[in-house]
Amino acid sequence: EPGGSPDPLYHKRNGEIEMGKTYIFGHKNPDTDTITSSLVMANFERKMGNSEAVACRLGNINKETEYVLNYLGIEAPELIEKVEDGANVILVDHNSPSESVENLENANILKVVDHHKIALNTSYPLFYRAEPVGCTETVMYKLYKENGIEIDEKIAGLMLSAIISDTLLLKSPTTTDEDRKAVEELAKISGLDPEVYGLDMLKAGTDLSSFTIDEIL
């Protein structure tokens, strides 16, 4: 049950409960999907009973993401550069060690939620969810729905922003019906107009403020 007993994935490999924080982060040179996914996944983990989940980032926030966080009134994730040996981590929006945190090879990877090709090898089993969709947040949207976890207005805004960013307002060739369905639902929950808000967001990340949406896309 959401909010009930901790997820069994929080057992260490030797069967003992691992105390301490769970660090959740996306790739280096973070984009909007990476930053929002860490925040959305941390919220998901807390709702699932992991009170130690912490959203992190591996680099500076770009202008587009800054616009999103300011618009929604949400603080940026904590900046980290490396993790200690044995630290519990969850990877979002990436799985390749070369794009990840320093010392990942000595961390305890609990979960991966992603939409990229698989480049990760571990010597132990873990929860791995990757789908061929346009954005990690589309996968996160499905995880919330499957687990009966409420998507509130701000979480919906984060998810929506990332899908708009990664799929360029659903116009990128990587866009799938899953992404379109998520955007439709998340627009209702967040109260944001994907076209109007999305264009403002994309403009904020560029110096294309004088161009129309058709010229940009």
State each model region's role:
Residues 1-7:
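Short, positively charged low-complexity motifs
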